[in-house]
Amino acid sequence: GAYHSLGLKSNGSIVAWGRNNYSQCTVPSPNSAFIAVAAGAYHSLGLKSNGSIVAWGRNNYSQCTVPSPNSAFIAVAAGAYHSLGLKSNGSIVAWGSNDYGQCTVPSPNSGFTAVAAGVSHSLGLREE
C-alpha cells in the first residue's frame, strides 16, 4: 500500500504492518483461510479460499464495498482507491474510484486469466 504492507502466511492468516490510520492493518476476524492479499493506498483486500473477498481500511470511494455476489473470485488486486476481483468465469469485477476509467472493464468482459492494478489504472490479462 502507500504506507502499509501485507503478508500471507502458509496457515492462511494475514500479517499487516505499517501506517494504520484507516485500520488498513487491522485484519478482520476470523484471520484465516486467506489465499491471496492486495494492498491499496489505504485499504486492504484478502481473498478467502471459498472465493469471497474481505476488504477493510479507508472506504472513501467504496473501494472496500465488495459488489454482490461476493463469490467465485480467484484473484484480487488493489489500486490507490479502487479494487479488482477476477471471477472463475474469466470476468473482472471492479469497484471504487473510477476517476480515470480504472473501473471500466473493456468489452468483452471475459477470457481474463489475471488482474493487476496501479495507482489509477487496471490491467487484465486475457488467454488469447
Q: Model segments located where?
A:
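Beta-rich catalytic cores
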Residues: A2, A33, G40-A41, A72, ...
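Conserved core positions of repeat-based scaffolds
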Residues: H4-G7, A16, H43-G46, A55, ...
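Short glycine/serine- and acidic-residue-enriched loop/turn motifs that recur at repeat junctions
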Residues: L8, G18-P30, G57-P69, L86, ...
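Acidic/polar residues in short coil/turn loops that connect beta-strands
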Residues: N11, N50, N89, E127-E128
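Short, hydrophobic beta-strand segments that form beta-sheet elements in well-ordered domains
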Residues: A16-G18, V37, A55-G57, V76, ...
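Blade-level signature of beta-propeller repeat domains, shared across WD40, Kelch, NHL, RCC1
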Residues: A116-E128
